[in-house]
Amino acid sequence: MKVSIIIPVKNNEIFLNRCVESVLNQTYNDYEVIIVVENGTENMIKLCNFYEKNNKKITFINKVNKMRNNLKNIGLEKAKGEYVTFVNPNDTIDKEFLKYHMYFAETHNAEIVSSRFYTNKRLFNNKIKDYESVYRDKEIMKNYMLMNIRSNVIAKLYKKSLFNNIEFPPEEYYDEFRTMYKLYDKCNTLVDIKLYTYYKESKQENYDYLSKIDYCVEMLGFIEEKYPELINYCKVKICCEAIYLMSKVEDRNDRKYLFEYVKLFRKYAINDRRLPRKVRSRVMKSLLGFNMLDTYIKITK
């Protein structure tokens, strides 16, 4: 078995049928599908049982509430593939998703192959001149700190052995952010293919946005210990995250709390010409105080 496709399902996902059909439509054939469901409705469980009964590729796991574990970890425990990928139950993948990712994984002996995802925007042209970027060893973490590589777990193929001694945290808010930099640390070769292969259903998430800044500080400690030469890049990344989170948080006092992180790390970002103009403008506005930045973020959303 080459690839295990893990679909973690929380609650009643209305697009699961569409998701599974896109997975079963792959042109690459050597794969299995593991559907892990938590708190599934009766109809959801019936649907998953139907899929498992009628397609030998599919394994259905009905998680009970007392099993305090991330659904992705449960899928990984059952996975038989040399490689794994994760698909959210509201999303769909291109029919050649596995074909492209496996080609680049085997061509470059890569442990991670990453592609692009899109939401509700129609793609008129999926052809890009610079077709692939290959990062090796410490280049991987550097480019993650430089924000050339993203922290999303979706739209990627992983060598399953990367997850030896690495698990997703039980708390599923920002579990990807808290895990991906640890995988990048273990990865020797990462290929970024500039193709849109994954459709992400746009929906409003009820995230605890403030918790992410705490996880950023957790990441800072990791970088300080293992990649001290990248510490300033990490501080730029945290400054940008804090500004982004300010645009998401409704409570004014919470935005003020995030602004303290902007003040703490903005000196590392203020002259960083890699940053998009909009982000640099926000960093500059922060020098004029919280009220100015807060207002500027609202009018430039």
Protein language model annotation of sequence segments:
Residues 1-4, 32, 178:
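Cell-envelope/extracellular polymer assembly enzymes that use nucleotide-activated donors
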Residues 2-15, 19, 26, 36:
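A conserved hydrophobic helix/loop-capping motif in glycosyltransferases and polysaccharide synthases
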Residues 20-62:
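Acidic donor-binding segment of Leloir-type glycosyltransferases
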Residues 63-79, 89:
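Glycine-rich, basic loop-to-helix element that forms the pyrophosphate-binding segment
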Residues 68-69, 91-193, 200-208:
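Donor-binding/catalytic cores of nucleotide-activated saccharide
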Residues 84:
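Short aromatic/hydrophobic "clamp" motif used to bind/position activated sugar donors
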Residues 195-233, 241, 252-269:
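Catalytic core of nucleotide-sugar-dependent glycosyltransferases
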Residues 252-301:
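Membrane-interface aromatic/basic loop that binds lipid-linked glycans or pyrophosphate carriers
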